[in-house]
Structure formats: C-alpha cells, structure tokens
C-alpha cells in the first residue's frame, strides 16, 4: 500500500532541515556539489511546498517567489527518483501556480533543466531561450501565462 501524500509547506524546524536536505539530495548531490544549503536572498520571502508521505518522507519539493508585482518564478523543483512519473511534480506545480495567482501574478517563469522540458511543456510552459545555470547543466528559460 502506498503512503498517503500531502502537499504542504514545512512546519517545524526538523521539517525545514529535512526539506533543505532533500533539495540538496535531489538537485545538487547527483552533480557532486558539496552539501551547502540551497538558499538565496529570496528564501525567506518565498513559498515552499513539499510532498510528504504519512511516514514523514519528503518525496517532492518546489519553491515560488515573486520577481515583481506580476511575475512569479518557480525554483528548486525536484521529485525523488523512485517517485517520478506518479504525478507528484504536477501536484507541486499546481500548488505553486495557485499561490502565484493568490499573489496576483499574471505569469510564471522558470529555468528548467533540459531533461525536464517535456514535463514543464505538459504543464503548459513554453520554452523562451537557453539559460546558463551555475551548475553548468543545459537549462531553458520557460514561461506560462496564468488565466
């Protein structure tokens, strides 16, 4: 039987630590990047969501921040390798998009790893231009207009 999965923000200090560790584990460890928390100047002003199982395992995550009054940006999206293609990424994107609408955004941008382009296209995002990431992995800037 599969665990029940809840999409929500981390609540406790312990959950925030697990969330930070998960982001590194999924997004940076495979690139052999040292375990440094993935935090920037927008971290505290951002909206963080995770998919967490009833056994308290984080299996997906994503973050949203506002670039300006009308444009939001998704960053740090990731899904556990053994949980991919189960709809968890879509659930996180839906929650992030709903948050962007609440904040008054008219569009969302993101910089997708090229291996994830088809996923984001399936969510309604359009490729805009190549993006140079600090990870040296090919990325593409994408955008979606909210309705």
Model feature map: region roles:
Residues 1-14, 145-147:
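Conserved N-terminal entry element of GNAT/NAT acetyltransferase domains
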Residues 21-54, 58:
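Active-site rim helix/loop that mediates acceptor-substrate recognition in acyltransferases
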Residues 43-45, 70, 134-138:
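Short acidic/glycine-enriched loop/turn segments that link adjacent beta-strands
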Residues 50, 57-65, 73-78:
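Conserved beta-strand in the GNAT
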Residues 79, 85-98:
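Conserved acetyl-CoA-binding loop-helix of GNAT-fold acetyltransferases
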Residues 93, 99-113:
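Conserved GNAT acetyl-CoA-binding A-motif
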């Amino acid at each position: 039987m599969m665990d029940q999965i809840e999409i929500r923000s981390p609540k406790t200090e312990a959950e925030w630590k697990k969330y930070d560790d998960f982001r590194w584990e999924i997004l940076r460890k495979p690139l052999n990047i040292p375990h440094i928390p993935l935090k920037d100047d927008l971290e505290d002003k951002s909206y963080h969501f995770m998919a967490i199982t009833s056994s308290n395992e984080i299996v997906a995550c994503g973050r949203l921040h506002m670039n300006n009054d009308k444009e939001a940006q998704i960053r740090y999206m990731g899904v556990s390798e053994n949980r991919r293609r189960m709809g968890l990424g879509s659930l996180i994107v839906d929650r992030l998009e709903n948050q962007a609408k609440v904040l008054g955004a008219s569009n969302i941008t993101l910089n997708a790893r090229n291996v994830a382009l088809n996923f984001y296209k399936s969510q309604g995002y359009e490729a805009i231009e190549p993006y140079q990431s600090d990870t040296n992995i090919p990325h593409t800037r994408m955008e979606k207009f909210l309705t």
